[in-house]
């Protein structure tokens, strides 16, 4: 299932994946509608935001069912499964892990039951930077009891640990304690909730159906289910939707710092962020790139697909012909089968192949979205030269990525970032290009039509809008050690009855059933 707007070209190297977003989230409250089907289609539209796992939680008012597994949305769900997920409220999640390993336990939505009998399911796009601090305050054993080691499970537990409060009231207490980037959708038996961190780092939009409401990571997910865009969920806002309508509350003062990299790559080109169409922004970035880095050439080609809009803009501004020079195989890299060493050695040739008749004897401008480690660009330059290109000029539609992201994009470590150790000339020599040009940070910001003060630019300039803890208390696997300690102390932790007792679920919560029984508030996997 290829993503609609292409993968980062760094992912063309199967041994070294490039930046990945944390997740895509979707929620719907719509009595009388097939909410599981709507959620499936919404997740399908958000598949580009996460390909490790997918899940849907649904409720008919009497109980919550969560169905999730590792794999793409279309691999996890089939028609009989969706038909069995009946209700009026649902949330869904497409996962790429930024905290916690890629395991079934860490797939989302996560679920917890309170001692008062309410069940909470939650899905998260983003990354908390104070997860270690929160888990110490909550207690290791309680956090890790269900085998999960991600910050989403931690937040779900915190919400469920206040049985004397309604879910809405508990959220207004818990959300101000969280530091980092988060766009949440969560639910109980009757109500859909959505919340966005005070900086609004990750996107979250509200839509209207004829008979209900939808919340999603991107506007494209609203389009696919026929919902009209109402507005963005505001930074620092909590929304609750039930039979009484929509309620909004502030849990923090807004200090907008939307992710600049969403415009470069993460969001679909048909999405709209802060009123700006992403495709139009990327074309404008390409125009700016041409103004800043002119070159005499015969053909402008994109690295498909994420480099295409910027290449269109570059060609239009420079007057150089736009054309195809690389063909991409969309079916490589979409499987859990590990490639053999022979396939690994083929590397980028598995995914890209030059159009030799188009590039032979030409001076090429190759437009890509970003450079992380440089492996893919190095291979592309070599491949195009072997195909007969006279010159290869690389143009990048973002500034050098020199700093890792701690707010929901799984970049390489700083030591692995090529721009951290080399200047532009060093990078040019490293990848073997005749010339190399990056768009300026000011040029990129101008293309978004957002003021600099409202954007998170940390991966480009190292200015992190949310204070970070010491290195030992942050990172993708910060909670993994806790899980190992708890497992060592409790060798039978993963038996179904014990997991159920510790996590507050009934024994069916841990069942590995082929299909959920909607009569029970349970969590299932395929």
Language-model region placement:
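Secondary-structure transition/capping motifs at alpha-helix termini
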Residues: 144, 164-165, 292-298, 316-323, ...
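Generic beta-strand/beta-sheet core signal
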Residues: 123, 187, 195-196, 207, ...
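Short, glycine/charge-rich flexible loops or terminal/linker lids adjacent to PRPP-binding catalytic cores
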Residues: 319-364, 375, 402-412
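Conserved short alpha-helical segments that host acidic/polar catalytic motifs at enzyme active sites
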Residues: 2-235, 240-297, 303, 391
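A conserved beta-strand->alpha-helix junction
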Residues: 148-149, 153-156, 322-333, 430-448
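Flexible loop/turn segments at secondary-structure boundaries
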Residues: 35, 98-99, 130, 201-202, ...
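PRPP-dependent phosphoribosyltransferase catalytic core
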Residues: 175, 190-191, 226-232, 252, ...
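Phosphate/diphosphate-binding loops
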Residues: 173, 221, 228, 236-237, ...
């Amino acid at each position: 299932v290829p993503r609609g707007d292409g993968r980062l070209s760094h992912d063309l190297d199967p041994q070294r994946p490039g930046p990945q977003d944390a997740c895509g989230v979707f929620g719907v409250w719509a009595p009388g509608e097939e909410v599981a089907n709507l959620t499936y289609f919404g997740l399908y539209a958000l598949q580009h935001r996460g390909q490790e796992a997918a899940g849907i939680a649904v409720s008919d008012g009497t109980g919550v069912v969560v169905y999730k597994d590792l794999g793409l949305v279309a691999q996890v769900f089939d028609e009989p499964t969706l038909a069995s997920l009946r209700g009026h409220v649902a949330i869904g999640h497409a996962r790429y892990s930024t905290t916690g390993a890629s395991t079934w336990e860490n797939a989302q939505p996560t679920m917890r039951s309170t001692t008062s009998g309410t069940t909470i399911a939650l899905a998260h796009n983003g990354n908390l930077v104070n997860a270690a601090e929160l888990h110490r305050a909550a207690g290791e054993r309680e956090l890790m009891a269900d085998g999960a080691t991600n910050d989403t499970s931690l937040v779900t537990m915190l919400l469920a640990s206040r049985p004397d409060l309604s879910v809405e009231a508990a959220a207004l207490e818990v959300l101000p304690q969280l530091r980092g980037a988060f766009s949440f959708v969560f639910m109980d038996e009757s109500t859909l909730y959505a919340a966005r961190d005070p900086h609004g780092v990750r996107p979250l939009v509200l839509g209207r159906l004829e008979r209900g409401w939808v919340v999603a990571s991107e506007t494209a997910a609203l389009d696919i289910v026929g919902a009209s865009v109402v507005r963005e969920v505001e930074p620092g806002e909590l929304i609750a939707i039930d039979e009484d309508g929509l309620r909004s509350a502030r849990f923090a003062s807004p200090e907008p710092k939307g992710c600049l990299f969403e415009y470069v790559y993460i969001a679909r080109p048909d999405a709209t962020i802060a009123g700006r169409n992403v495709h139009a922004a990327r074309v404008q970035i390409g125009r700016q790139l041409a103004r800043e880095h002119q070159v005499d050439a015969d053909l402008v080609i994109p690295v498909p697909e994420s480099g295409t809009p910027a290449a269109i803009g570059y060609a239009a501004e420079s007057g150089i012909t736009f054309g195809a020079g690389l063909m991409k195989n969309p079916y490589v890299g979409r499987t859990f089968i590990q490639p053999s060493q022979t396939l690994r050695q083929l590397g980028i040739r598995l995914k890209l192949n030059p159009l030799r008749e188009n590039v032979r004897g030409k001076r090429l401008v190759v437009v890509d979205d970003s450079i992380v480690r440089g492996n893919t660009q190095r291979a592309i330059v070599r491949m195009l030269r072997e195909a007969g290109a006279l010159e290869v000029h690389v143009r990048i539609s973002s500034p050098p990525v020199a700093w890792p992201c701690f707010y929901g994009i799984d970049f390489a470590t700083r030591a692995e970032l090529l721009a951290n150790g080399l200047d532009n000339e060093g990078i040019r020599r490293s990848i073997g290009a005749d010339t190399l040009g990056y768009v300026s940070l000011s040029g990129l910001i101008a293309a978004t039509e957002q003021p600099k003060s409202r954007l998170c630019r940390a991966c480009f300039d190292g200015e992190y809008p949310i204070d970070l803890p010491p290195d030992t208390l942050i990172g993708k696997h910060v909670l993994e050690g806790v899980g190992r300690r708890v497992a060592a102390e409790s060798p039978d932790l993963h038996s179904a009855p014990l997991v159920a007792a510790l996590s507050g679920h009934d024994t069916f919560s841990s069942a590995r059933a082929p299909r959920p029984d909607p009569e029970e508030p349970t969590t299932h996997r395929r």
